[in-house]
């Protein structure tokens, strides 16, 4: 443990900058009283995300020491009691008395006073990530227990707090002069965050990894004493020599790239007072595209001026390259076209950043956009000119997206029930007559046979039927080009008229319920899985809003004494057969439907389509990350993941069977 607190110049490649750092550098702006009363104003709420935000705040302070060149090692430890310890081997928080508060140490002022810290002045930190002095005092106010230890000039200074109040005076003991840094151990207050909330090891580990990616010169030592998921180590040294390029490589499938190169760079400009790092790649489909940005190691999920600069640079670069090779199709390119399938990670370090809101989710600093744009544009021009084959391939990729977008826009501009101009709907669609979407339903069926029965069984005013031609495409393992050119997907998107992905507009959705109606057998379940995958990856908002349903057509028809009964699956058939045999000794005849097309329209209406007699399964989307993993495992490109998923589910099913048999 003591090694962590040691400072060794040989371990540190970056130059250490020694400056005078004392109590006079700590500025005081305000008090701490409002924090416990209104925590949401400072950390965005009192839920699990807000609680984990406390870890980010303490870690940001440690990262600031590293970014400023004063620390090379950071440690994060999650203890058995669910408390967290974060340590950095930096200079240590000043412990001498503060000029404005002669009876208080600077350490106590920082921990008990809102808006106190050294980050308001450029003399100590040129770039800072914590909440400008708010961070550690807010963590203290919202912690049941907090203990801070400072190693400085051969002494260990320690002090304990609870709910923002001091429990002990500053205590000092003699230690080795080699030890330096700050250690903070804290436990969130259950009165604020609920007793059932505990830190999630996976979440904290990912926070630590993201910080290590952002500053390649820092090593973060991770240790967890509580039980962790199989994909999270108990102990690890987190260090990424290639920074954001390493991060992006770990998040994408390298065999699914439009061009086999990641466009990345790492630039520091003393003249412009900016440090900039980025990594961008383009994938063959947009199902896993993402954009993450940071300013001074703080996540900016709502983007801001740094993202605007990057986007403008890439747009300008591609248009300039297109003009150079004489391709006129780039004239209509937009930022949305270029970043439709792009995954991006961006990090900037600047002096005195300006953010929107207390929790810093959007960067609004003036001048940053142009700086970022100019730097990245120069490097992107060189990237494109260095390999014209790859550059042309990338250009053709984004132009195809642009043309598809413009075609979809033209289709969306056509009103669904406009009396003077009819929508160019798919030829196989049997639309309903009601002009508004309220109370209407679209049944998606496979093939003309099932479509014919469904069209005869429907309520023409409120129910539409769309038979899909050919094989339904698995969008999880298909390129964007295949998705765009697939006839079944084109028909479906045109019929719904709501657009997909970033172009989704719920007000344009033409039906209130979208009902997947497939055969009740294994083949039907496979088709339903493909369609659900399509909706999850292309129209997740539609699923979240509760528009997607699965029909439950019968697989079996049971007849006894001229009475007809229906069963959806084998288990229901067995139960129904047993029940009928108990009530009557009459013979039971069992028939199995080969598909929806074999059913008479009256039967289909009675069992599957009549709103008062049918059963529907509503498809919901709650744990998005888990669903995303399942879709990737089961429907993605890698067969080994699919095999493992099926194998694990088979084991679960076998256990259920064994339990039922009581073996």
Swiss-Prot record:
Function: Topoisomerase IV is essential for chromosome segregation. It relaxes supercoiled DNA. Performs the decatenation events required during the replication of a circular DNA molecule.
Organism name: Rickettsia typhi (strain ATCC VR-144 / Wilmington)
Segments forming domain Toprim: 440-554
Protein name in UniProt: DNA topoisomerase 4 subunit B
Enzymatic reactions: ATP-dependent breakage, passage and rejoining of double-stranded DNA
Ligand binding (Mg(2+) 1): 446, 519
Disulfide-bonded cysteines: none
Binding site for Mg(2+) 2: 519, 521
GO CC term, one of those recorded: chromosome
Site (Interaction with DNA): 471, 474, 526, 642
Transmembrane spans: none
GO biological process: one example: chromosome segregation
Subunit annotation: Heterotetramer composed of ParC and ParE.
Co-factor remark: Binds two Mg(2+) per subunit. The magnesium ions form salt bridges with both the protein and the DNA. Can also accept other divalent metal cations, such as Mn(2+) or Ca(2+).
Top EC category: isomerase
């Amino acid at each position: 443990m003591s090694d962590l607190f040691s400072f060794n110049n040989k371990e540190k490649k970056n130059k250490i900058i020694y400056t005078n750092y004392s109590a006079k550098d700590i500025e005081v702006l305000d008090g701490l009283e409002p924090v416990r009363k209104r925590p949401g104003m400072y950390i965005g709420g009192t839920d699990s995300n807000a609680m984990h935000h406390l870890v980010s705040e303490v870690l940001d302070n440690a990262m600031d020491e590293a970014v400023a060149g004063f620390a090379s090692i950071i440690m994060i430890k999650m203890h058995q009691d669910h408390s967290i310890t974060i340590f950095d081997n930096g200079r240590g928080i000043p412990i001498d008395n503060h000029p404005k508060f002669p009876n208080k140490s600077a350490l106590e002022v920082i921990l008990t006073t809102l808006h106190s810290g050294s980050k308001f002045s450029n003399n100590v930190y040129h770039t800072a990530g914590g909440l400008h002095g708010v961070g550690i005092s807010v963590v203290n106010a919202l912690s049941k227990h907090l203990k801070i230890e400072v190693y400085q000039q051969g002494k260990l200074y320690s002090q304990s707090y609870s709910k923002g109040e001091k429990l002990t005076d500053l205590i000092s003991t003699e230690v080795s002069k080699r030890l330096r840094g700050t250690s903070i151990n804290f436990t969130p207050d259950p009165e604020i965050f609920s007793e059932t909330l505990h830190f999630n090891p996976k979440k904290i580990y990912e926070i630590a990894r993201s910080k290590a990616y952002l500053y390649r010169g820092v090593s973060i030592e991770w240790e967890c004493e509580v039980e962790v998921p199989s994909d999270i180590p108990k102990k690890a040294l987190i260090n990424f020599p290639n920074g954001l390029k390493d991060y992006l490589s770990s998040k994408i499938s390298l065999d699914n790239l439009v061009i086999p190169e990641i466009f990345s760079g790492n630039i520091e400009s003393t003249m412009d007072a900016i440090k900039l790092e980025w990594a961008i790649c383009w994938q063959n489909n947009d199902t896993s595209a993402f954009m993450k940005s940071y300013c001074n190691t703080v996540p900016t999920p709502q983007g801001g001026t740094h993202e605007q600069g990057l986007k403008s640079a890439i747009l300008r670069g591609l248009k300039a390259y297109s003009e150079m090779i004489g391709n006129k199709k780039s004239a209509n390119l937009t930022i949305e076209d270029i970043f439709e399938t792009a995954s991006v990670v961006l990090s900037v370090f600047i002096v005195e950043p300006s953010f929107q809101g207390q929790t810093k989710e959007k960067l609004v600093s003036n001048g940053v956009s142009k700086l970022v744009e100019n730097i990245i544009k120069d490097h992107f021009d060189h990237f494109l000119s260095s390999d014209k084959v790859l550059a042309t391939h990338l250009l053709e990729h984004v132009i195809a997206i642009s043309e598809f977008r413009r075609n979809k826009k033209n289709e969306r501009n056509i009103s669904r029930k406009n009396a003077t101009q009819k929508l160019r709907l798919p030829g196989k669609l049997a639309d309903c007559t009601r002009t508004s979407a309220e109370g209407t339903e679209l049944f998606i069926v496979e093939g003309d046979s099932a479509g014919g029965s469904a069209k005869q069984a429907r309520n023409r005013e409120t129910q539409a039927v769309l038979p899909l031609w050919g094989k339904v495409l698995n969008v999880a393992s298909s390129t964007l080009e295949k998705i765009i050119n697939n006839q079944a997907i084109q028909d479906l998107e045109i019929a719904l008229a709501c657009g997909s992905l970033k172009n989704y507009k719920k007000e344009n959705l033409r039906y209130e319920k979208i009902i997947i109606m497939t055969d009740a057998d294994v083949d039907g379940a496979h088709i339903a899985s493909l369609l659900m995958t399509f909706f999850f990856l292309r129209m997740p908002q539609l699923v979240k809003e509760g528009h997607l349903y699965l029909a439950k057509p019968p697989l079996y028809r049971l007849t006894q004494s001229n009475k007809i009964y229906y069963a959806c699956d084998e288990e229901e058939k067995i139960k129904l057969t047993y029940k009928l045999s108990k009530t009557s000794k009459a013979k039971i005849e069992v028939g199995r439907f080969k598909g929806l097309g074999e059913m008479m329209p009256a039967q289909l209406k009675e069992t599957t389509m009549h709103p008062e007699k049918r059963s529907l399964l509503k498809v919901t989307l709650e744990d998005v990350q888990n669903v995303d993993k399942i879709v990737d495992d089961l429907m993605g490109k890698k067969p080994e993941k699919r095999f493992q998923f099926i194998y694990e589910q088979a084991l679960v099913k076998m256990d259920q069977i064994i339990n039922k048999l009581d073996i």
